[in-house]
Amino acid sequence: MRKFLIFAFAAVMLAACNKPNEKMNNDLITRIAEIEVNDGYLEEYLAAAHNVGTKSVESEPGVICIFPMQVKDAPNTIRILEIYRNEEAYQTHLQTPHFLEYKQGTLHMVKSLQLVATEPLAPEAMPLIFKKY
């Protein structure tokens, strides 16, 4: 009887682990923005990046994450993790007043910008990491 219970428990756990996450979204857009800030504009740029990231996540349902980070050994290098629910959410984000203000207000501060498309390796962890997912 004990072996049967262990087997039954293992079967239930295996089924639970293999159950697809109903919230899993194959339409996610994930990328890392790599930004080099011109000398003399770092503090101003950091404030603008913080502001647009916070406003976007707070006010846009399709924005899961905008997380600016500064490279420790290269302070003028900024990386921003961006996650959008889908293409429509991304396009909507590009038209918001807070994004347009950020974009226009920082054009002269940015030396270079590269958007690197990424593919999540553990999408099942998204609900554990991001409250909005």
Label every PLM stretch briefly:
Residues 4-12:
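Sec-dependent N-terminal signal peptides
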Residues 14-16:
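C-terminal motif of bacterial Sec signal peptides marking the signal peptidase cleavage site
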Residues 18-30, 67-74, 103-133:
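Glycine-rich beta-strand-turn "strand-cap" elements at beta-sheet edges
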Residues 28-36, 65-94, 132:
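Short, well-ordered beta-strand segments in beta-rich or mixed alpha/beta enzyme
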Residues 41-63:
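Short amphipathic alpha-helical segments
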Residues 55-65, 83-118:
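An amphipathic, aromatic/His-enriched active-site/gating alpha helix that lines ligand/cofactor pockets
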